[in-house]
């Protein structure tokens, strides 16, 4: 088997790319070789690709000293495959290059198979790795799975405000301002009323300034440039900012946490990052819940603007009617293209793991003749590589939330929002592959 995920095939949807990497890591980790028959090579961005060709040549020479004939042959085969893949690249791709080549055992533990993976990661891996052994080294790929959502922080108190972003483990201070607000006036009489009014006016102007700078720092091209915003402070300022209409309406929906901190400035930022950690983790979780809840609402309202089940969803996708595909990240359905060897016509079917073991799906219904398998793909992987051809987007759903669990159990783990209504033959009584029959009385909790 030869698999190549070459530069230029990178999707603009980071969650899809992360899903692909997660599946690839799982596939690589399940590969077992005979002795030292598997090569892992990761080349960092901007490195001279020619020096790695020389590295492999040196490793090839060293392999000639291996006494065991079988081991020597395995190592030479793996290094040769890696060199051949490396020759396909004149220079190191922008984000670096990952190569995994070698000979592995099949599930029976006896049959051997040659596999080659080469791909440019969807973001840089700034780490060199060369390893020749009985398994692939995937640890550097784990960095690609770190969610790089950017979050904004506003730390505000009576001394000033700080604006910052947090992306992964990297934080950036965007702006700092200081303020001198008048203290409360202890004397009575008319002067206290006047001072109180002036103090309140300055406080109001200060908060308005904080809000204006929030707009400047966290809105780009008329939309928020961060996934979520954390408001933090050691006084009532943060609460007033969240509850008044000073903040731009476009920012209000992305406020994910309001936390009390003991300090202002950078110390307050450090504390806010710690206190808001759970809220930041839940942002994607909440977004998923909202998306699936909207899907359920469309069903309840019978708008005709959603589709579910593998057969209906794929039919609507082929018609170009699906705007967003909802896809269970562990979807256990394969896509088969079958060909009648006599008539020459082909058909596409979708089978879950149980159905794949039933030979009836691979026979002609009229004649009982065996059909040729033209192609077999994981449906999820096929969608991730082809969704753009249909003008659609893909959103992954987990079964970790109540809504996600319902989506997987009741709707087969696949569905979609439509651009327009389409007339699809009603198969809702039988979802086919991957799902139980949908019962509106039991599948909504």
UniProtKB/Swiss-Prot annotation:
Keyword annotations of the record: Cytoplasm, Protein biosynthesis
Matches recorded under PANTHER family: PEPTIDE CHAIN RELEASE FACTOR SUBUNIT 1
Highest rank taxon of the organism: Eukaryota
Protein name: Eukaryotic peptide chain release factor subunit 1
Cellular component annotations (GO), alphabetically ordered: cytoplasm
GO molecular function term, any single one: translation release factor activity
Subunit structure: Heterodimer of two subunits, one of which binds GTP.
Pfam family, one: eRF1_2
Gene3D superfamilies: 3.30.1330.30, eRF1 domain 1, eRF1 domain 2
Main subcellular location of this protein, as a coarse class: cytoplasm
Location of the protein in the cell: Cytoplasm
SMART domains noted in UniProt: eRF1_1
Function (record text): Directs the termination of nascent peptide synthesis (translation) in response to the termination codon UGA. In O.trifallax UAA and UAG codes for glutamine.
Xref: NCBIfam families: aRF1_eRF1
Family that this chain belongs to: Belongs to the eukaryotic release factor 1 family.
